[in-house]
């Protein structure tokens, strides 16, 4: 794959209801749906009010249960199949990262860094051990919106929450250190729903920087695609365009193809393994099964792409040679 297929560009910007910003609101809506399930795997009481505060009508109706996501699959000639599984898939994804953070902090790690935290409310809803410091990195307007909205709800963080209001395309390590981050202490990092929204070279830079900032014993959890066949790029785009068309038909204008970066990129797992991380990868179907969920609907017309949930520990920390 050599083309990007993206409408993104260097230095582009967005708000909470458009472009990449709206994807975090979509994720929060899915968490709200998962929280309302009959036997919920997660409990995120802040997802629905955060979606309401953004004000995208269809996403608000999804979050409150007024609209069923399965109703998007309303063309019998081109069924989308897996779209009805979005709440369950979000539940297992959220549970994966929740469990990762709790295991890491209960093992003694006191620093947590959430990259591109979006509408993530873990600093408010997880039972963090004492002394845990949670650093949230995202754009200033994203951080400010979430802080104000949750304060208006009377919510209080359950850890020492420190906001790092900076674009990941800027010097975020300096901003992180300025907030009190200590690279000599082990850290629990998350890259949830992030890597696909980065250009290939930016993904490498991010993973390199995380490694450089990580003391031995640090832990990392990430969501990433694997097994993307270059021959299937156009098929992937067509399927994403069909999903976008269904959203638009119900009043929500979003271009999923334009938000992500296609093209050749290093797969995150071998890339990180080469840099000292010992990782375990769990495909989404296995994660569903481990959480007692039935297999997801099969998209017979869709591409064969694996969504992996990856976690592991840094045992050796490559450091650049000092300048002469």
UniProtKB/Swiss-Prot annotation:
Q: Which GO terms describe its biological process?
A: methylation
Q: Which domain of life is it from?
A: Bacteria
InterPro entries on file: Ppm1/Ppm2/Tcmp (IPR007213), SAM-dependent_MTases_sf (IPR029063), SAM_mthyl_Trfase_ML2640-like (IPR011610)
Q: List the disulfide bonds.
A: none
A single GO molecular-function term is: methyltransferase activity
- Quote the SUPFAM superfamilies the UniProt record gives: S-adenosyl-L-methionine-dependent methyltransferases
Identify one Pfam family in the record: LCM
| The protein's Enzyme Commission number | 2.1.1.-
Q: What is the role of this chain?
A: Exhibits S-adenosyl-L-methionine-dependent methyltransferase activity.
S-adenosyl-L-methionine among keywords = yes
Look up and give the organism this protein is from.
Answer: Mycobacterium ulcerans (strain Agy99)
Recorded hits in PANTHER family, A to Z, give: S-ADENOSYL-L-METHIONINE-DEPENDENT METHYLTRANSFERASE YKTD-RELATED (PTHR43619), S-ADENOSYL-L-METHIONINE-DEPENDENT METHYLTRANSFERASES SUPERFAMILY PROTEIN (PTHR43619:SF2)
Q: Which family does it belong to?
A: Belongs to the UPF0677 family.
Its taxonomic placement starts with: Bacteria, Bacillati, Actinomycetota, Actinomycetes, Mycobacteriales
Q: Residues that bind S-adenosyl-L-methionine, according to the entry?
A: 138, 167-168
Iron-sulfur found in the keyword field: no
Spell out the protein name for this chain. Putative S-adenosyl-L-methionine-dependent methyltransferase MUL_0818
Q: What are the UniProt keywords, alphabetically?
A: Methyltransferase, S-adenosyl-L-methionine, Transferase
Query: EC class of this enzyme?
Result: transferase
């Amino acid at each position: 794959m050599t083309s990007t297929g993206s409408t993104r560009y260097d230095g582009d910007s967005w708000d909470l209801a458009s472009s990449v910003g709206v994807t975090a609101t979509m994720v929060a809506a899915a968490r709200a749906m998962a929280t309302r399930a009959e036997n919920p795997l997660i409990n995120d009481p802040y997802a629905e009010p955060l979606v309401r505060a953004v004000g995208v009508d269809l996403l608000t109706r999804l979050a409150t249960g007024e609209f069923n996501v399965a109703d998007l699959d309303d063309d019998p000639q081109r069924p989308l199949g897996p779209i009805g599984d979005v709440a369950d898939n979000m539940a297992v994804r959220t549970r994966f990262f929740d469990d990762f953070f709790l295991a890491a902090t209960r093992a003694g790690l006191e620093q947590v860094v959430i990259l591109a935290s979006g509408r993530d409310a873990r600093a408010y809803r997880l039972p963090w051990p004492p002394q845990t410091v949670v650093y949230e990195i995202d754009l200033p307007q994203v951080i400010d919106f979430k802080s104000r909205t949750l304060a208006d709800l009377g919510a209080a963080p359950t850890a020492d929450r420190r906001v790092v209001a900076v674009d990941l395309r800027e010097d975020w390590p300096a901003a992180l250190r300025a907030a009190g981050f200590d690279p000599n202490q082990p850290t629990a990092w998350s890259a949830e729903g992030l890597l696909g929204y980065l250009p290939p070279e930016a993904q490498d830079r991010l993973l390199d920087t995380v490694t450089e900032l990580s003391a031995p014993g640090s832990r990392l959890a990430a969501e990433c695609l694997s097994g993307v066949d270059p021959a299937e790029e156009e098929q992937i785009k067509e399927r994403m365009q069909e999903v976008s068309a269904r959203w638009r038909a119900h009043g929500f204008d979003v271009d999923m193809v334009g938000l992500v970066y296609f093209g050749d990129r290093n797969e995150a797992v071998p890339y990180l393994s080469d840099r000292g991380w010992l990782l375990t990868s769990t495909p989404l179907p296995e994660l569903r099964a481990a959480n007692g969920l039935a297999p997801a609907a099969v998209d017979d017309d869709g591409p064969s792409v694996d969504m992996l949930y990856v976690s592991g520990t840094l045992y050796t920390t490559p450091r650049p040679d000092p300048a002469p």
